[in-house]
Amino acid sequence: MTTAAPATWTFEEAIDRVGLGRFQFKLMAICGAGWAADAMEVLLISFALPAIRQEWGLSTAQAGLLGTAIFLGMLAGAWFWGTLSDRIGRKLGFILTVLIDSGFGLLSAFSPNFATLVLLRALTGFGVGGTLPVDYAIFAEYLPRKQRGRYLVYLEAFWALGALVAAGLAWLIVPRVGWRPLLAISALPGLIVFWIRRYVPESPRFLLVHGREEEARAILRQVARENGA
């Protein structure tokens, strides 16, 4: 890929030219790990709920509120982070959403009472609600047109992987040491993903739309070099 090429191609043509290669495979693994970690956070409460109800003597209504708290947070998070990523860029949300959901997920393990746990699960959902659309956007914007639909479907498969891991951990942990270790351990993958995501560049499409052409060209050259284009 020549240094002059991005000035004469449209963005979609430039992405097609840099092709599908090592960069996109790494990005899919990074996004996919985040999706798997989010699936664990969303589903683990359903596995932990019987033990929590027994420990705190929750009513059916309280159990229902605890089970849905994360989805209420996701509703708010999807709107907030989706809007923010269109205004200031994908990368900030790409990093912070995982930190938020894994951080509050970890704090959930130390909840002293029911109300605190509900609040922390809602805040966890606020992060999860942002991770899903922001990851989808940044991954899609690095994919060539011909492979875009197929690889976005591949990304969604990581959610199923996270669900299987959550079920396996719950089966191993909850009967032996209780629900708190399950919540703590399930937050660790997200913290690792947060650390790795700091090195992912901003979406070149976002940069072009906002007039930052030189930065976009530099990133496209980086992707081309990594893919051997």
Task: Name these PLM-found stretches.
Residues 1-229:
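Transmembrane-helix signature of 12-pass secondary carriers
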